[in-house]
Amino acid sequence: IVGSYTYVYDYAGVLTDETMEHIDAMNASLFAQTGAQILVSVVNSTGGADIMDYASDLGNSYGVGSAERNNGVVMLLALDNISQSGLMGDYCVVVGTGLESHADDFMSLQSYYLENDFAAGEYDAGVKATFDAFIAWFADFYGVTNREGYIPAVRETYSSGSGYYYTETHGYVAPALGSLVS
């Protein structure tokens, strides 16, 4: 449904529909293949809460990522928060416990792809570039193909030789719909 987003919440109104649709479509493909999800949230303020705690709470309340793998990621921008450096605006990324050993990768990607656009007020461009870098990281990490609309078809087939069912996966292009509940 256009205008109804599952993986992105823009309470500040700075992201384009195109970017939000892209985030949803790519997340649906990522989730179908790996159970991983990237929640993107843009708020005006965290209401005085620590930005990392706020992001962690978002991830936990939405159930981001696979419960078995704990491979969810939350990218949060708080436009009116005061950063640790004293500047207006702050952002962070938090990862599930299954990705904790890779947290530095995500922080480095966010710093590299978001910082300049964030400082210039180009939030949409920065979010999209950072999100795409996260998607590329996951694709490499799990060895999967990730593109809009690509959701692998999973089919159970009965083997008369062994008497067991086995799973076959074939790629196909389909409308991408996702869910944050795994």
Task: For each feature predicted by the language model, list its residue ranges.
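Folded, non-transmembrane soluble domains that reside on the lumenal/extracytoplasmic side of membranes
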Residues: 1-180
